[in-house]
Amino acid sequence: MRISTDQLATQLARKLAPLYVVFGAEPLLTLEAADRIRAAARKEGYIEREVLTAEPGFNWSSLNMSANSFSLFASKRILELRIPSGKPGVEGAEAVVRFCQRLPNDTICLINLPELDRTQQNSKWFTALEAAGVAVEAKEVARQQLPMWLGERLALQKQQCDKETLQWLTERVEGNLL
């Protein structure tokens, strides 16, 4: 299932999925989505966290070893896999598909990816991730939507500003919300 970052809070309030994939064009929104997922998991007792980063030379068998290992300290844990390039390669793609077929119990899996093109999103490994859990897409905030988006963000913090200030902020952060 694919949702937007705006829909994530509603999805997390219902029930935690065993797998979340966070990807997209807007780094701030991907960071915030991953933080929300981790916070919701901690609230449900998922205390321990293991992070794997798939860089060149990554041993893909470590993904399944981590998934199948038991924690000495906590019964519930978060297993996070970061694929900074968004390209797991042939071996990685096969490992991801196998991983999706046997998701570990008492583990919330969080996969962090950058922006993916249409070919990557239609790949076997990504469609397996999407079918096994919830894919959260962080789309870039369009220029015409940015003033409203900034206003909503300010309102969430119980702040407000006039239209001229909002326009000034929009001009300064366009293309770089971080």
Model-predicted regions and their roles:
Residues M1-L178:
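Conserved beta/loop motifs at nucleotide-recognition and modification sites
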